[in-house]
Amino acid sequence: FINCSYPKTDEWAELTFKTSNLTNFKTNVDLHLLSYIWISNLFAQQMVRKNTDGSIILTSSIYGTIPQKQNLYEGTNLSENIAYPVIKAGINQHCKQMASFYGKNNIRVNTVSPGGLEGKIAGKELQQDKIFKEKYISRTPMKRMCKPSDLVQIYLFLSSNDSSYITGQDFIVDGGFSLT
């Protein structure tokens, strides 16, 4: 089971340090984080009921581990989002909690944390801001953004029996960005 749900409100972009409000923050954290917790837990419970072992993979982000780099957003049409790293850090910790609880049922739980992905902005037809992309690439040792194809093999590996003794881990796929 791969959980990559991404529910958010229309006010998601307003969740900056300067423009957020408590209601918007709480609503988005509830939608996004609870979708991961609830759906993954329901799936794990079903696996236990059916006596099925396997893998649950939660899609997180490097921003669940490192802070957003403010200078990447300067001069762009993007801004930091104060809810996003809170949500992703919560997903990472939930992974560890689930792994420790469901390990006895031979259910593995891991996260995949991509760096900046090449392509359209999540849930929108807009392409990424060119200045943001240039700044991001300049900080990345591999000098490019993550492509969806860069993620396929880690998801396949974690879904397979080749990872039968791996649980509670966060797999960062960011071309070295988090090292800088």
Language model regions located:
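Short, small/polar-rich loop/turn modules that mediate ligand/substrate recognition or access, typified
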Residues: 103, 108, 166-168
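Catalytic loop of short-chain dehydrogenase/reductase
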Residues: 6-9, 18-24, 48, 57-90, ...
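A glycine/serine/threonine-rich, flexible loop-to-helix segment
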Residues: 15, 69-74, 104, 114-140
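A conserved structural motif in NAD(P)-dependent oxidoreductases
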Residues: 140-151, 162
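Conserved NAD(P)H cofactor-binding loop of Rossmann-fold oxidoreductase domains
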Residues: 4-12, 176
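Short C-terminal tail/terminal secondary-structure segment
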Residues: 156, 167-180
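A short, exposed helix-loop element centered on a Lys and neighboring polar residues
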Residues: 40-41, 96
